[in-house]
Amino acid sequence: MTEASIDENIDKDEGGSPAPVSAKKKLPLGLDLGTLESCVLSKLSKPGSGEHHGILVPTVVGYPEEGILAGILPGNSGMLHGNDALANQLHLRLVHPLSDGVIQDIEAAKSFLGYLREQVDPEQKADALCVIGIPAVADDEAKTKLEEAAKSVFDGVLLIPEPFLAALGMRDEEKLQEPDYKDPVSNSLFVDIGAGTTDFCIIQGYFPKPQDLLSIPFGGNEVDVILDQLIRENYPEVNLPISMIRGFKEEFSYVGEPESGIRVKVPVEGKPRKIEIGKQVGEACNRLVDEITDSLKQVIASASPQSVFSLLQNIIITGGGSRIKNIDQEIQLRLVEDGYENPEVRLSEKDYSPLVAIGALKVAKAAREDQWLH
């Protein structure tokens, strides 16, 4: 989809250009295919309602362990997905189809995408036309894998960079005429902190060019690994699964000055024990901010001289990492300390999870028939 075609179609009525007559109705879909969690959307909410119709599903497929007895798994299923897989993980071999936002297991990805389609189109009586978010600088191999998997499930596919879709999802079209409204699509710098990567994107009203995009392989998963290492260094007798480490991070994450008083219960040789992890959580999360700030400087330096000062006033943090306490304030403080003039860093929304899918659905509703990959 070209820059011009996206701009032209997004601002049109949802009907767009007349599509060829088909026996099936069209079902536009927006999909955020995440490393840990995905969101699929078939209906837009009323602007400003604060609600969304997205279906959130953990990105995981479960295969039964060899020799599993009948009646152990629901419906004696040969494969489970999402929450069903996690609820029965004791009896399953869990496979995450994606790593760092890129498909690693093509068959698991196809199965998972098929499961997502069933959630919004269980009878498959419609032509499902799906726009899917991709990492900011996904290479050709990553795009080809995703396209192959998606085309095996959906009737039409479009792949669009995730930060652009997040900006579009955040945009409130009803407020565009308000003088104080900062349009996230007009001139902004989006920072999308995911599990596998952190993506940066300059958005200036059109489809981003390659030079407007940057992606680093550092996100929530790296924070988990660092936190695990720090806990092991301080408590050698403690051996925790990464899922438990991730749970501590998600509950207690913060950046800035070290905090104490974060005590958690862990098993040591089967016995309960409480340990203090406040300093370790802060150090792990601050490492993420170090990486983000260094990359932000690189992206800001690439912005055009006529746009950079207003761009600095519209830096938006989204993705799972946006839930880290004080992350927007800490990044803004570091930019000020480095000499940037009046930067303004803010969080996208209280609930970031549907933004990419909302933006994807807006594109899907506006796309012309000849723009879909079949």
Q: Model-found features: residue ranges?
A:
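Nucleotide/phosphate-binding catalytic cleft detector across ATP-hydrolyzing
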Residues: 1-53, 64-67, 84-190, 203-287, ...
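Short hydrophobic/aromatic beta-strand or adjacent loop that forms the aromatic wall/cage
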Residues: 58, 359
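N-terminal low-complexity or amphipathic/hydrophobic leaders
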Residues: 59-64, 70
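N-terminal structural subdomain of ketosynthase/condensing enzymes
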Residues: 68-83
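C-terminal, charged low-complexity interaction regions
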Residues: 193-195
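A structural feature that tracks compact, well-ordered secondary-structure segments
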Residues: 199-201
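Periplasmic peptidoglycan-binding/anchoring modules of Gram-negative envelope and division proteins
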Residues: 294
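Repeat-based blade/solenoid architectures
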Residues: 354-356
